Amino acid sequence: MAEAAALEGSEPVDLTKHPSGIIPTLQNIVSTVNLDCKLDLKAIALQARNAEYNPKRFAAVIMRIREPKTTALIFASGKMVCTGAKSEQQSKLAARKYARIIQKLGFPAKFKDFKIQNIVASCDVKFPIRLEGLAYSHGAFSSYEPELFPGLIYRMRQPKIVLLIFVSGKIVLTGAKVREETYSAFENIYPVLTEFRKVQQ
């Protein structure tokens, strides 16, 4: 997993934290913040060039910035959701930028209760997996209906993370509030994945 190491700043993988030698890559961070003031969404949409507002479709202004590349949903209550950042710091930086845009439009926006709500990460174990066998022996945690969705959905209890496991060995992890939960969920599942490794004929 040289790519993961390169992304994390090119130091070698710390095997005490990541015994599998694989570090899941963060793909999307969802965060929320309270701007703590009522907002006139129509006025915001008219004044901000990176904003769209279609109240018949959705009761929020959708705003986008390029750096960090993110999308915000801004509600009249002053609540805001920020999605698309690739790290916690980037998510907070983006949320601050949106808050600043709202301030510049003349609203007394604050920055209260910033919170990471969901971290989505992915990785590749680089070997195929027997999903039927895994689903059968871990029935309490797994749902696998290949006609509906090609991946096995594994609901881990501790940490409370949902994993999508694909035959190819690609894994998506979602539901974490801190990245360590993502890492420990992956380390928990890794021995199970190796147990159900498909033997190539």
UniProtKB/Swiss-Prot annotation:
Recorded GO CC terms: nucleus
Source organism superkingdom: Eukaryota
KW Transcription (keyword) present: yes
N-terminal signal peptide: none
Location(s), subcellular: Nucleus
Keyword set, alphabetical order: DNA-binding, Nucleus, Repeat, Transcription
GO biological process entries: DNA-templated transcription initiation
Single GO MF annotation: RNA polymerase II general transcription initiation factor activity
SUPFAM superfamilies linked: TATA-box binding protein-like (SSF55945)
UniProt similarity note: Belongs to the TBP family.
Subunit structure: Belongs to the TFIID complex together with the TBP-associated factors (TAFs). Binds DNA as monomer.
UniProt function note: General transcription factor that functions at the core of the DNA-binding multiprotein factor TFIID. Binding of TFIID to the TATA box is the initial transcriptional step of the pre-initiation complex (PIC), playing a role in the activation of eukaryotic genes transcribed by RNA polymerase II.
Name listed for the protein in its UniProt record: TATA-box-binding protein 2
Organism the protein comes from: Triticum aestivum
Taxonomic lineage of the native organism: Eukaryota, Viridiplantae, Streptophyta, Embryophyta, Tracheophyta
